[in-house]
From Swiss-Prot:
Disulfide bonds: none annotated. The keyword Zinc applies. Residues 590-668 form the BRCT domain. GO terms for molecular function: DNA ligase (NAD+) activity; metal ion binding. GO terms for biological process: DNA repair; DNA replication. The keyword NAD applies. Keywords: DNA damage, DNA repair, DNA replication, Ligase, Magnesium, Manganese, Metal-binding, NAD, Zinc. It comes from the Bacteria. This is DNA ligase. Its cofactor is Mg(2+); Mn(2+). It comes from Lactobacillus johnsonii (strain CNCM I-12250 / La1 / NCC 533). The gene is ligA. PROSITE patterns: BRCT, DNA_LIGASE_N1, DNA_LIGASE_N2. Zn(2+) binds at C406, C409, C424, C429. NAD(+) binds at D37, A38, V39, Y40, D41, S86, M87, E116, R139, E173, K288, K312.
Length: 668
C-alpha cells in the first residue's frame, strides 16, 4: 500500500467505508450481493490496514468494528446477550500457518483443532427453556437479530422439544440443499417469478419471511455447531458436536480433530476436490481450537473470536471455448454483450454463458469468437471470464468487431457522453418495450404478481400488449390463450392488475422506467410535488430544487415527459383509473414536535437503540436523517466515541444533542 498523508488516509477510509457499507447492506439486509467475495474481502482488508496505520481514524460505526449488517426488515428484533460474532477470513495455507503460530504463541504450546466445513447459509440461534424451543433468531448485526421463531417451527430438522429439560442456546447455519434450491427456482421460473441467485440467498429469503407458511414450503435445513453455554462435562468442540447430535440437533459429521497443520491441509485438499459433490453448499473450511477452556482463554476481538478462523476456497476455474458473442437490449436501451461458450461444469452447475458487460470490457479482455478462455464464478455465483488462453488461440482468429446496429430493431447504436455502454435510442424498439413492461410489473414498482418475463413475452408475441397501458385493457379471453394459464391464474393476474391502480404515484413514476429515475428519486419528487401529472410538467430548476435530485435526473425526466408519446401514455394510464396522487407517509402525518422537518445526523456508538431503530423513530417524527454533516444539518445527535462528524459539526456550529437529550425530546 502506498504511503498516505493523514488527510489522504482519512478520505480513503471514508471512501472504503461507504463501499463496504453498501455491499454489506446488499448482502445482509437485501440478500442480494452485488460484488464477489474476493472483491469485498480485498477492500475490507485495505480498510483494516489503513485503520491499523492510522488508529485515530477508527470509529465505533466503522464496518471493521461491527458484525454483519444493520437490521432492515419488518421482523421483530432480538437482542443477543452473547453477541453472535463473525469469523476472521484467510485465503491461503500460509495464512493458516500464521494463525496456528499465533495461537501457539498465545497459549504457550501446540493445540488440536476441530476442523469443520464452512456451510454457505444464514447464521441462526436457537434458544430452549426447559427443553422446549422458545426463540429462534438470525445474527443480524451481531448484537441485534431478527425473530424467526414462527418460521423455525417449520424447519424439519430443528427439534421443537429436547429429550432433556435443558435451558440453553445453540447456534448454527440455516441452508438450502442444492436439490431443494433447483426445485424452488424451477417453480419460480415457471410462474414467471424472479429466481434466486444462489442457495444462500434462497435460504436467507425463506427464513426471513413474514409469512411462516412460505418458509414451510421452502424445505430448509440446518447444521448446528456451537453451544453457547455447554454443560460442565463438555470440554471440547468435537465433544460438543457429538452431544448436540445426541440431543437431536442436525450436526455436520464431516468435521475432524487434527493435531498437525499437515493433517488440516490434507482435509482442505480433500474437500476442495469434492465440494461440488456435496448435497449442500460450502465456501470454505473452519478451524476451531478444540479445547473449550483455551477458547475462553483466547477470547474475542471486538468483532471475531481469536480461537477460530475460516479458510475461504479460491474460485474454481475451468477452460472452455467461446462460440459466439450475443448482444441483448435492456429496458433503457443499453446493449450488453454475452459470451456463448461450450457448456462446462463449474462450481456444481453447467455454465454456457458469461456477461462481457460493455464494449470497453470486451476490448480489455480481448475475447474473440473461437478463443479458449478461463472461466470462474465470481463469489461462487456469477460466471465470469478470467482471461484468454492466448496459446490456444486459432491461427485464423480475427479481432471481434463491435456491432453498430441494435440486434432487436436494427437502428444505429450510439455512445452517449460519459457512458461506456452502447445504447439503442429507438423508443419503439421491441426489446426495450418488453423489458420496460417487465420492470413496470416488478415488485419494486407496480408489484403486479404473476406478470413475469414469460407471460409478458407471450402477451407481446400475441399482439395483446404494446405498452404498459395495454395491461389495463387485458381480458380473461386473451389471458386464456396463454400457455399453461388456467382460470385461477387468470383471476389472480387480473386482480393484481386491478389492485395496482391504487398504488401511490411514486411507484408509477418509478415503473415508467425513466433513465436515472430510481425508486428513491421518484419518492423524493412525489413527496414534494404530490401529483404525477404536475411532475410531468416540471422544469429542470424545479426538480433540482429538491435535495439530492441533480441535473442528470432532472434532465432525463423532463426529456422523457417532453415526448408526445410519454404524455399520451400518461393520459391513457389516468383514463384507465390509475392513481396519480402521492398517498403520503407516516412522516407527513406526524404531529408537531421538536424534530419535525429537521435534518438530523447520527454519530458515535448509541446505547439505547440500534442506529436503524433510532433513525426510524426520528423519521416517524418527520425528521430527515442523513449520513453527513453540512450547513443544512439542524442537529447532530452523538453517542460514545463520536468522531469526525462531531468535529465537523463543531466547526460548522451545528447544534448538538447527546443521545439521552435527543431521547428526552422524542418522548415529550
Amino acid at each position: 500500500m502506498a504511503v498516505l498523508t493523514h488527510n489522504e488516509a482519512s478520505q480513503k477510509v471514508d471512501e472504503l467505508r461507504k463501499k463496504l457499507d453498501k455491499w454489506a447492506d446488499d448482502y445482509y439486509a437485501k440478500d442480494a450481493p452485488v460484488v464477489e467475495d474476493a472483491v469485498y474481502d480485498k477492500t475490507y482488508q485495505e480498510l483494516v490496514e489503513l485503520e491499523e496505520q492510522f488508529p485515530d481514524l477508527v470509529t465505533a460505526d466503522s464496518i471493521t468494528q461491527r458484525v454483519g449488517g444493520e437490521i432492515k426488515s419488518d421482523l421483530s428484533k432480538v437482542e443477543h446477550p452473547v453477541p453472535m460474532l463473525s469469523m476472521g477470513d484467510v485465503f491461503s495455507k500460509d495464512e493458516l500457518k500464521e494463525f496456528d503460530e499465533r495461537i501457539t504463541k498465545l497459549v504457550g504450546h501446540s493445540v488440536a483443532y476441530n476442523v469443520e466445513l464452512k456451510i454457505d447459509g444464514l447464521s441462526l440461534s436457537l434458544e430452549y427453556t426447559d427443553g422446549k424451543l422458545t426463540r429462534a433468531s438470525t445474527r443480524g448485526n451481531g448484537r441485534v437479530g431478527e425473530d424467526v421463531t414462527a418460521n423455525a417451527k417449520f424447519i424439519k430438522d430443528i427439534p421443537q422439544t429436547l429429550p432433556e429439560p435443558l435451558t440453553t442456546e445453540v447456534r448454527g447455519e440455516c441452508y438450502m440443499e442444492k436439490e431443494a434450491f433447483a426445485t424452488l427456482n424451477a417453480e419460480r421460473d415457471e410462474k414467471g417469478e424472479q429466481v434466486f441467485a444462489n442457495p444462500r440467498n434462497a435460504a436467507a429469503g425463506s427464513l426471513r419471511q413474514l409469512d411462516a407458511r412460505i418458509t414451510k414450503k421452502r424445505n430448509l435445513s440446518t447444521f448446528i455447531y456451537t453451544w453457547v453455554n455447554p454443560p460442565r462435562n463438555i470440554t471440547s468442540q468435537h465433544q460438543a458436536i457429538d452431544e448436540m447430535n445426541r440431543l437431536g440437533f442436525h450436526t455436520n459429521q464431516s468435521g475432524r480433530r487434527f493435531e498437525s497443520m499437515d493433517e488440516v491441509f490434507k482435509f482442505i485438499d480433500e474437500y476442495t476436490a469434492k465440494r461440488n459433490d456435496l448435497s449442500y453448499g460450502i465456501d470454505g473450511i473452519v478451524l476451531k481450537v478444540d479445547d473449550l477452556s483455551l477458547q475462553n482463554e483466547l477470547g474475542n476481538t471486538v468483532k471475531v473470536p481469536r480461537w477460530e478462523i475460516a479458510y475461504k476456497f479460491p474460485p474454481e476455474e475451468q477452460e472452455t471455448v467461446v462460440r459466439n458473442i450475443e448482444w441483448t437490449v435492456g429496458r433503457t436501451g443499453v446493449v450488453t454483450p454475452t459470451a456463448v461458450m461450450d457448456p462446462v461444469k463449474l462450481a456444481g452447475t453447467i455454465v454456457s454463458r458469461a456477461s462481457l458487460h460493455n464494449p470497453d470490457y470486451l476490448r480489455e479482455k480481448g475475447v474473440r469468437i473461437g478463443d479458449t478462455v478461463k472461466l470462474h464464478k465470481a463469489g461462487d455465483i456469477i460466471p465470469e471470464i478470467s482471461s484468454v488462453v492466448l496459446s490456444k488461440r486459432p491461427k485464423d482468429s480475427k479481432p471481434y468487431e463491435i456491432p453498430n446496429v441494435c440486434p432487436s430493431c436494427g437502428e444505429t447504436l450510439v455512445h452517449l457522453q460519459d457512458e461506456v455502454a452502447l445504447r439503442c435510442i429507438n423508443p419503439m424498439c421491441p426489446a426495450q418495450i418488453e423489458e420496460g413492461i417487465i420492470h413496470f410489473a416488478s415488485r419494486g414498482a407496480m408489484n403486479i404478481m404473476g406478470l413475469g418475463p414469460r407471460i409478458v413475452k407471450q402477451l407481446i408475441d400475441k399482439g395483446f400488449i404494446n405498452d404498459v397501458a395495454d395491461l389495463y385493457q387485458l381480458t380473461p379471453d386473451q389471458l386464456g390463450q396463454l400457455d399453461h394459464f388456467k382460470e385461477k391464474s387468470i383471476t389472480n393476474l387480473l386482480s393484481s392488475i386491478e389492485n395496482s391502480k391504487q398504488n401511490s404515484a411514486e411507484l408509477l413514476l418509478y415503473g415508467l422506467g425513466i433513465d436515472h429515475v430510481g425508486a428513491k428519486a421518484a419518492r423524493l419528487i412525489l413527496e414534494k410535488y404530490k401529483n404525477l401529472e404536475k411532475v410531468s410538467q416540471l422544469t429542470v430548476p424545479e426538480l433540482t430544487s429538491i435535495d439530492t435530485i441533480g441535473e442528470t435526473i432532472a434532465e432525463s425526466l423532463t426529456a422523457y415527459f417532453n415526448q408526445p408519446s410519454a404524455q399520451k401514455l400518461l393520459q391513457e394510464l389516468r383514463d384507465s383509473g390509475l392513481n396519480m396522487e402521492y398517498l403520503g407517509t407516516v412522516e407527513e402525518e406526524a404531529p408537531d414536535n421538536f424534530f419535525k422537518e429537521k435534518t438530523v445526523v447520527l454519530t458515535g456508538k448509541l446505547s439505547a437503540f440500534t442506529r436503524s431503530e433510532f433513525t426510524k423513530k426520528l423519521q416517524d417524527l418527520g425528521a430527515k436523517v442523513t449520513g453527513s454533516v453540512s450547513k443544512k444539518t439542524d442537529y447532530l445527535i452523538y453517542g460514545a466515541d463520536a468522531g469526525s462528524k462531531k468535529d465537523k459539526a463543531e466547526k460548522l456550529q451545528v447544534p448538538m444533542l447527546t443521545e439521552q437529550e435527543a431521547i428526552a425530546k422524542i418522548e415529550k
